[in-house]
């Protein structure tokens, strides 16, 4: 198991995420939206009212290992991201976390080193339609640490006014707006799952979440 300690204060690369519609079956693979494929011991995370958090993506870490030369993430296993995003996808009756740092329970990151035996967790509306956006394919390439867009690692693209929230942290996942999904974060915003800059690379126990908006 890798236990490299990550350090802060120097320029690091990030990993750009490209997200593309596909007809391919992505069960058990890296994908954005769709249904999460979880180990038997894991449940789909819920908010404090018992409602399912929006499943954002799952990433097979083998897919990004060649781009992570500093070993800031494990190079085996799967990581899953969830957050309370229905409001920003057009459901104006859903809870809205606002700008700045969100409360615990409104987001969740899961990690498992073993992802050989996963169960697809499906969720449908009463009319039988999937209660999720269609799963989309993900590809990865190198990026600069402060780039906008969808990326792993690096630093948040939007920092002005949020310096206190970001101190001592680095971005784990950054998510930008996307017209194709009707996804907006107020006025030109981004969200970031944040982790301590100094940590072992398989430690996801202290994740925070921040919405940055101009």
What are these regions (language model features)?
Residues 1-214:
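Preference for intrinsically disordered or flexible, low-complexity segments
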């Amino acid at each position: 198991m890798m236990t490299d300690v990550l350090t802060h204060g120097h320029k690091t690369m990030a990993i750009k995420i490209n997200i593309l519609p596909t007809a391919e079956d992505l069960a058990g693979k890296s994908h954005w939206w769709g249904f999460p494929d979880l180990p038997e011991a894991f449940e789909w995370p819920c908010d404090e009212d018992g409602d399912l958090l929006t499943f954002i993506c799952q990433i097979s870490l083998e897919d990004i290992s060649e781009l992570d030369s500093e070993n800031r993430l494990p190079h085996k296993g799967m990581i899953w991201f969830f957050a309370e995003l229905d409001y920003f996808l057009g459901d104006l009756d859903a809870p809205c976390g606002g700008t700045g740092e969100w409360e615990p329970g409104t987001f969740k990151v899961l990690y498992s080193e073993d992802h050989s035996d996963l169960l697809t967790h499906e969720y449908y509306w009463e009319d039988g339609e999937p209660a999720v956006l269609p799963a989309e394919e993900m590809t990865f390439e190198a990026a600069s640490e402060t780039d906008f867009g969808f990326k792993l690692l690096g630093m948040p693209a939007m920092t002005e006014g949020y310096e206190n929230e970001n101190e001592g942290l680095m971005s784990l996942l950054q998510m930008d707006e996307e017209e194709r999904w009707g996804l907006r974060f107020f006025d030109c915003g981004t969200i970031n799952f944040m982790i301590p800059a100094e940590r072992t690379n398989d430690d996801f126990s202290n994740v925070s979440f921040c919405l940055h908006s101009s």
